[in-house]
Design a protein with these regions (language model features):
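N-terminal intrinsically disordered, cationic/polar leader segments
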Residues: 1-102, 109, 113, 117-129
Length: 129
């Protein structure tokens, strides 16, 4: 698991005492990479992009802070794994959920820590799916 990018901008000098609304949008993509060389490993990939926006409750159209982050989780299948078997598993929603369920809490926790570092305490931000 790794952070690919993080970008934040906070226009508020102090968020304490302000009634702030926050919107968060996660986008999750899954992929299966097949090896292009003999003896290579298949890889399952989960890419997560999270964007967020903070605004005063009485002026929701005026962004006070914007946040965006990208994350990647990589899952290596054993070298001896059968390509047809892994591909069939990867098509099943339960297998996809298993991969995302391992990656999303890490991304969400990191995103929340970065928001806290900027003065936004969002205890109700979802950490799981």
């Amino acid at each position: 698991f790794r952070v690919l990018s993080l970008s934040t901008e906070n226009k508020l000098p102090n968020v304490t005492g302000n009634e702030i609304g926050f919107e968060m949008t996660p986008v999750i993509d899954l992929g299966l990479a097949l090896p292009c060389t003999p003896g290579g490993q298949m890889q399952g990939m989960v890419n997560i992009r999270i964007t967020g926006r903070a605004a005063k409750k009485d002026a929701p159209d005026e962004s006070l802070a914007v946040f965006s982050a990208s994350y990647e989780a990589l899952f290596l299948y054993p070298k001896e794994a059968d390509e047809a078997d892994v591909s069939a598993r990867f098509e099943r929603e339960t297998h996809q959920y298993m991969l995302v369920a391992q990656a999303f809490p890490l991304a969400s926790s990191h995103f929340r820590r970065e928001l806290m570092a900027m003065g936004f305490n969002l205890g109700n931000l979802p950490l799981g799916l």
